[in-house]
Every structure is written in structure tokens, then in C-alpha cells.
Regions:
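Auxiliary Fe-S-binding modules of radical SAM enzymes
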Residues: 1-50, 54, 66, 82-86, ...
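Metal-dependent catalytic neighborhoods of phosphoester/phosphodiester hydrolases
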Residues: 108-109, 275
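Glycine-rich active-site/cofactor-binding loop and its immediate structural neighborhood
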Residues: 59-100
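Distinct, well-ordered alpha-helical segments
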Residues: 109-112, 140-149
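Nucleotide phosphate-binding site architecture
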Residues: 38, 59, 163
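Structural motif
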Residues: 52, 101, 131-135
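Hydrophobic residues within beta-strands of alpha/beta enzymes
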Residues: 96-98, 130, 155-157, 224, ...
Length: 295
């Protein structure tokens, strides 16, 4: 049974239906729906959304994720970037998050589609803040260079869990490769803010979480999200424990002392939850001063 702090208010049914109608009208997918995010009612009610590009079927089989898997998903839709840009304009979004399924079947892993989507958003809404949440592109520097050159305001790549749990939770991923990706972003464009996130409750230990946080600071990661893992179905990795809100708060305090510009740490936090608010907090004078002190 889930603890009381994970209970959510019923979403605004009218706002939910309106958002879903808009997404269907534009033929778009969201990670909010695909990953069964517990916050989608709140986000859709506020007119915020995380767009999912490159289809809604993944080539990997992470045991925490609800998105369906397939060795060779359908070819990407070339009209996707423009439709995302039009939907964003229709919603009046000031901060857009774009993520994707992992497409190991594509030569560039979908990097070109990320770049096209950023460019399409900028053409329609030049002032919009674009945040991208990318896969590891199997370690391809060229693919990473493609997305960095498109100059999103934030580049996010989630480590998801601690190294020890990768074989059972992310069997086709590699902790070192993901950490290196975040380092390479800074090598390519030092001023680009990077962001990463972890799910807690998969069986990790406190010292392992702190080690991952330290690893992220060693590659100059700026922003961190920590949230509770929730099992999508009985076939997925079990929840080993529910982490209390007080523990999440302790990690937030430690993270800020480590020098992260901003840390969102709470049971229902997800990597793009309240992304605009997180971005603004990260650019506040207080967070800039904190980051400067920890350099």
C-alpha cells in the first residue's frame, strides 16, 4: 500500500480532456502518458507537457519503465517537429520539455530529430525556453554534438539509479557512459546547463546515492531531480521501499551544499515536473552565488 504522501488529488477532468484532445489533434505523444507519470493530471491542468519524439515504442527494456519496447519500431514521423512547435504555440508555453524513446535502430540515435525540434520551436516561438531530455546515443560523440549545436537552454540526461543496480534496472545502458555524456556536454559547450535525475526506492543505499550525486558534481552537472520510483505494473521492477519526504529533503540540502544550482527532491518529483519553476530557481541570484562558492 502506498503511503499517504504519495496520494494525489483527482485531476481536473475537463482540463485533462482538453489537453488530450489537443495532443491527439496534432498527432503527438507525451512521456506523461507513456510512462504513466503520477503528475500528468496536475501538469495537463496547468497546460504543461513533456513531448515524446521518435514514436512511442522504445528499443530498450529498462525494468522500471512503462513505455512499450520493440526491436525495430516504426520509422520516425518527419512532420513531428513542426507539430510540436504548433501545439506549443497553441498552448502558449514558455518552457517546453522534449524527450524521446531510445532509438538504437537509428544511425544517429535520433539526435537529428532533437535538433530539428529545437529549431522548429525557435522559429515559431523565439522566446521559448527549450529543455531536452536525451538518451545516451550509445556513446556517440557526433550525435551529442548535433544536439548541443542546436543550443537548447537545458540538456538533461538521467542517470536514473546507482551503478550497482544498472544490470537489473537498465541492462542496455552503462553508468560510466551516461556520466561521460554529461561531461562531454561541458567539453563541447561549457556554459550549457546540464541536468540529471535519480529514482529512489529501487534498492539503492544512502551512500550510493551520495556517491552518484558527487559523481554528477565532478562532471559539473548543474541541476538535480530526485523522486520516488513507482512500479508501473506487476511485471516491472518492484518498489523496494518508499522513501520518506524528510529523507528527500535531506538529500536536497546535501545537494545544494555540494554545489548544484538547484535540487528538486520530493517523492512525486519527476525530471520535468515544474520544469519552468526549476529553471527559474536555478537562475536565481542565490543559486548562482551558491554554485560560485562551491567551485
Amino acid at each position: 500500500m502506498k503511503p499517504v504522501w504519495l496520494r494525489r488529488k483527482l485531476p481536473d477532468a475537463e482540463a485533462l480532456a482538453r489537453m488530450r484532445g489537443l495532443l491527439r489533434r496534432h498527432g503527438l505523444h507525451t512521456v506523461c502518458e507513456g510512462a504513466l507519470c503520477p503528475n500528468q493530471g496536475e501538469c495537463f491542468g496547468q497546460g504543461t507537457v513533456t513531448f515524446l519524439i521518435l514514436g512511442n515504442t522504445c528499443t530498450r527494456s529498462c525494468t522500471f519503465c512503462a513505455i512499450p519496447t520493440e526491436e525495430r519500431p516504426p520509422a520516425p514521423d518527419p512532420g513531428e517537429p513542426e507539430r510540436i512547435a504548433r501545439a506549443s504555440a497553441e498552448l502558449g508555453l514558455r518552457h517546453v520539455v522534449v524527450t524521446s524513446v531510445t532509438r538504437d535502430d537509428l544511425g544517429d540515435g535520433g539526435a537529428g530529430r532533437f535538433a530539428e525540434t529545437v529549431q522548429a520551436l525557435r522559429r515559431i516561438s523565439p522566446e521559448i525556453v527549450v529543455e531536452i531530455l536525451i538518451p545516451d546515443f550509445q556513446g556517440s560523440v557526433e550525435s551529442l554534438r548535433t544536439v548541443v549545436k542546436s543550443t537548447p537552454q537545458i540538456l538533461n540526461h538521467n542517470l536514473e539509479t546507482v551503478p550497482r543496480l544498472y544490470p537489473e534496472v537498465r541492462p542496455q545502458a552503462d553508468y560510466g557512459r551516461s556520466l561521460l555524456l554529461l561531461k562531454r556536454v561541458k567539453d563541447l559547450k561549457p556554459e550549457m546547463p546540464t541536468k540529471s535525475g535519480l529514482m529512489l526506492g529501487l534498492g539503492e543505499k544512502q551512500e550510493e546515492i551520495l556517491r552518484v550525486m558527487a559523481d554528477l558534481r565532478e562532471v559539473s552537472c548543474n541541476l538535480l531531480t530526485l523522486g520516488q520510483y513507482l512500479q508501473p505494473s506487476g511485471k516491472h521492477h518492484p518498489v523496494v521501499r518508499f522513501v520518506a519526504p524528510e529523507e528527500f529533503e535531506e538529500f536536497r540540502v546535501v545537494g545544494e551544499k555540494m554545489g548544484f544550482q538547484a535540487v528538486f527532491s520530493a517523492p512525486l518529483v519527476r525530471s520535468s515536473f515544474h520544469a519552468a519553476e526549476f529553471f527559474e530557481k536555478a537562475h536565481s541570484p542565490q543559486s548562482a552565488q551558491r554554485a560560485q562558492r562551491e567551485k
